[in-house]
Amino acid sequence: MPSTTLQQSFTANSLRLAPLTGADARALLGWRYNPPYDWYNPPPLSKEVVANLIDPKWQFHSIKADDALIAYASFGNDGRVTGGDYTAPAIDIGLGLAPALTGRGLGSIVLQAILEFAEMTFPSPTARLTVARFNQRAIRLYERAGFKACQEFTHERVAYWVMVKSLGEREHHSLTAQPA
């Protein structure tokens, strides 16, 4: 359960992004979501999975508030789902919020930090997310942040939306970023 200090950190938007460490990878592999979001549960802990998560080519980053791991983001091909059309130039973003923090209105602040980091770190003028259509909670968050659906496709009987947003179309908050 997040502490009062952690809640105040969210209010102050003082989130820190840094390349994912082995310890952070092992911690997030223990995250378990309640149905219907259990579909997002990470794979079981293994040396191979940890090695993939900390491999710089996948650009996984921890997101921390008061040194507590609250979320993660990936930048690049990991944010793509087989079957989508990703030919237009954009930075693909994958993300996850700690299960204990979901559904509490904190996603917008985390997403804002991710978008600011992406704008500072990657040359693309466009951010792109791929989201399962059943995840209406995430879709509402992305739409409120200015993302627009540009494509729908199905992979392994799951419908997805690809959503895009021009970077630079938001107000900036305080953010400490530690690029890879």
Regions found by a protein language model. Give the residues of each.
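Acetyl-CoA-dependent GNAT
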Residues: 22, 31-100, 117-121, 153, ...
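Terminal substrate-recognition subdomain of acyl/acetyltransferases
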Residues: 2-10, 154, 158-180
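Conserved GNAT acetyl-CoA-binding A-motif
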Residues: 120-130
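Conserved beta-strand-loop-alpha-helix junction that forms the acyl-donor binding cleft
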Residues: 128-139, 155-159
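Conserved acetyl-CoA-binding loop of GNAT-fold acetyltransferases
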Residues: 143-152
